[in-house]
Amino acid sequence: MTNLYEAYDVVVVGAGHAGCEAALACARLGFNTIMLTVSMDNIALMPCNPNIGGTSKGHLVREIDALGGEMGKNIDKTYIQSKMLNQSKGPAVHSLRAQADKMDYCREMRKVVENTDNLTLRQDEVIDILTENNEVTGVKVYSGGVYPCKVVILCTGVYLNARCIYGETSHYTGPNGLPSANHLTESLKKLGIEMYRFKTGTPARIDKRSIDFSKMEEQFGDEKVVPFSFINNPEDIEKEQISCWLTYTNENTHDIIRDNIHRSPLYSGNIKGTGPRYCPSIEDKVVKFPDKDRHQVFIEPEGNYTNEMYISGMSSSLPEDVQFKMYRSVSGLENAKIVRNAYAIEYDCINPMQLKSSLEFMSINGLFSGGQFNGSSGYEEAAAQGLMAGINAARKLSGKEPIVLDRSQAYIGVLIDDLVTKETHEPYRMMTSRAEYRLILRQDNADQRLTRIGHEIGLISEDRYEHLIDKERMIKEEMMRLENSLIGASKEVQEILEGLGTTTLKTGTTLAELVRRPELTYAALAPLDKNREPLPEEVITQVEINFKYDGYIKRQEHQVEQFKKLEGKKIPEDLDYSDVPSLRIEAKQKLNQIKPSSVGQASRISGVSPADISVLLVYLEQIRRKK
């Protein structure tokens, strides 16, 4: 007999980074939500790298925060080292990255989850998605019970039929020996959902007491910490930071790998899943880049109160005996004691082209999904999708239109658009190069781009919204003041400019023109700016960027206007592309499969040509005229 449990508005399956953001969003928007997980002890687990952020990923975390998500706040509480990457480059690619105390990160996120109204946490494995007439009605769990619900959000991570592999050893288990979920895939297949088999990997963990750090280069965090969350001030989160360390592989390391490559499951055929192109294992690096005589290896602490060190850059699935030799061949690791073996992990995920841009399945009403289940990789990509899936699930229950961020609004928009529009046969990783409008999608202005939307959704408080309005007012007023502040070509001014290493003046100018000079900073011009009032650092940053990159920003804004024209041409959901004359057969098939919401999205589909788009535009105009 089936045990009928309490009914919920929303069931979230999985309590990783995607699941937590999805569940918190739904609960905070007033919907009775339950989050089901195979292990309550591992909420927001970081099973691989011990960091949040990095190139493009830092952008995602700040966007999550700007919309009202939790990841940025949580890493600000639990970081052990913070660094702004790419500072020698332009602001478009500046990316914040923080080492996390993994255990603290889990604990703090669990505190938030357990203290959120409308949110219940329950340990159990979901084995079946229940539907009626292609509409979600509930989920069945391993214990035999059923949770009736209106919406389900699947955030299963790498746990579906997960198999961990190193050398000839393999076992069906999730990361770090956690239980895998071995029943849900069959339920999804019965619903007609197309599944993929992907693979990822992780390096060994080594006891820090066995490492000779004197042979390595110490890597410090930044003295001036930048928070991930816009609600935090730098001074509020400052703390003593822990160093990371840099070493390198060598020819001996590479010889050990080459001599044993036949024992790697990647090359023996024991691994069937497709791995991430941009996060290769060390054996992949050695095989694919034979001309490189060394590869970087970063030694990263996993927390304040553990001896485990993460060996970044050396993920592997080689046998245990080879791992010992390989790691011990690296300078500083000659006496390394492995406390956890490196391994690869295979798992089931979906073809994300079955999803709408709202992250709801096209074929099943009320079924949403987010995270690595959607074919992406990374904690940050997962959290971003989980947040958007949660927001749109809540809006569906409210009878509201979904929130779909486009490619000119956010990296989150680029991420989701790529997943649902472009075919991917490997784990998708976010990169700055994927964003066409990255100069206006900087991490420093995520709040100005997205906090209004978060406020309209209901995830941003009135106080936080007012803080944004005040910040924007200060930016505008300071820019106007600098534009109107005249500087004469006096002897004193010329001496100051000479001292700053910049060209002296021939005639008078404004402070704004001086700020525009690449070699000058706002701070350096203080001796020429007697009327300057103290301003928050975040305001000064915006003022400087707006002046220095004004021409480039305007050019990109013009490109966005052109982009918006095609995005604004909406396509009816029920359009059958088979009826569109003159469309090529491949285009008809791809368009019917993906069901793009706009002509802009249609133009980005692989196999749809510019000529097909012209045909489609003519057809849509004919439909419009008939109406």
From Swiss-Prot:
NAD-binding protein involved in the addition of a carboxymethylaminomethyl (cmnm) group at the wobble position (U34) of certain tRNAs, forming tRNA-cmnm(5)s(2)U34. InterPro entries: FAD/NAD-bd_sf (IPR036188), GIDA_C_N (IPR049312), MnmG (IPR004416), MnmG-rel (IPR002218), MnmG-rel_CS (IPR020595), MnmG_C (IPR026904), MnmG_C_subdom (IPR047001), MnmG_C_subdom_sf (IPR044920). Its cofactor is FAD. NAD(+) binds at residues 275-289. Keywords: Cytoplasm, FAD, Flavoprotein, NAD, tRNA processing. Coiled coil: none annotated. One of its GO terms (biological process) is tRNA methylation. Disulfide bonds: none annotated. It comes from Lachnoclostridium phytofermentans (strain ATCC 700394 / DSM 18823 / ISDg). FAD binds at G14, A15, G16, H17, A18, G19. It is found in: Cytoplasm. One of its GO terms (molecular function) is flavin adenine dinucleotide binding. This is tRNA uridine 5-carboxymethylaminomethyl modification enzyme MnmG. HAMAP family: MnmG_GidA (MF_00129). One of its GO terms (cellular component) is cytosol. Its main location: cytoplasm. Belongs to the MnmG family. Transmembrane segments: none annotated. Homodimer. Heterotetramer of two MnmE and two MnmG subunits.
